[in-house]
Curated annotation (Swiss-Prot):
Transmembrane segments: none annotated. This is Ribosome maturation factor RimM. Pfam families: PRC, RimM. Keywords: Chaperone, Cytoplasm, Ribosome biogenesis, rRNA processing. Binds ribosomal protein uS19. One of its GO terms (cellular component) is ribosome. It comes from Enterococcus faecalis (strain ATCC 700802 / V583). GO terms for biological process: ribosomal small subunit biogenesis; rRNA processing. It is found in: Cytoplasm. GO terms for molecular function: ribosome binding. InterPro entries: PRC-brl_dom, PRC_barrel-like_sf, RimM, RimM_N, RimM_N_sf, Transl_B-barrel_sf.
Length: 174
């Protein structure tokens, strides 16, 4: 069975010419939404639909997409709230020091002394930098900023992340 990764959610239509507004969940919108790219649309309790990107542009905080064979609003209204995905095996190769989010979810985090802190539970993207949520056994989750100087090494193959915790980041009093 093929695994899929979310690249965006269709939140509304845009105009009358078959365009949709997408809240993107990908770090590579230029690649994912390029003309001719194939996306899968998943909707509740329906079989996935293959869509081929006809056009892509940015508008405010949205990616605006149109699809081959869907020239007007009536063709795409039914796709609202659908999730756009790509097959995991269609992902591009990354440089040696780069990784996809899904590759580090579940990785074990170690502090500068080599002590295990917990595992990466999720990744938040609130603004200037990503924040990794580290689930710690019998303690509150640790919100770890993904910035140089804090995350010192990411070993995707061995599922190990080394960090240098800034003073005051861990508050185990609560």
């Amino acid at each position: 069975m093929t695994d899929y990764l979310n690249v965006g959610k269709i939140v509304n239509t845009q105009g009358i010419k078959g365009e949709v507004r997408v809240i993107s969940k990908t770090d590579f919108p230029e690649e994912r939404y390029q003309k001719g790219a194939m996306l899968l649309l998943f909707q509740e309790k329906k079989a996935p639909i293959e869509l081929v990107v006809k056009s892509h542009r940015k508008h405010k905080n949205f990616d605006i997409l149109s699809f081959e064979g869907h020239p007007n609003i009536n063709d795409v209204e039914k796709y609202r709230d659908g999730i756009l995905k790509v097959a995991k095996d269609n992902l591009a190769e990354l440089a040696e020091d780069e990784f996809y989010y899904h590759q580090i979810i579940g990785a074990t985090v170690y502090d500068e002394t080599g002590s295990e802190l917990g595992k990466i539970k999720e990744i938040l993207s609130p603004g200037a930098n990503d924040v990794w949520v580290v689930q710690r056994p019998k303690k509150k989750d640790l919100l770890l900023p993904y910035i140089e100087g804090v995350v010192t090494k990411v070993d995707v193959e061995n599922q190990r992340i080394d960090v240098d915790i800034p003073e005051g980041l861990i508050d185990d009093e609560n």
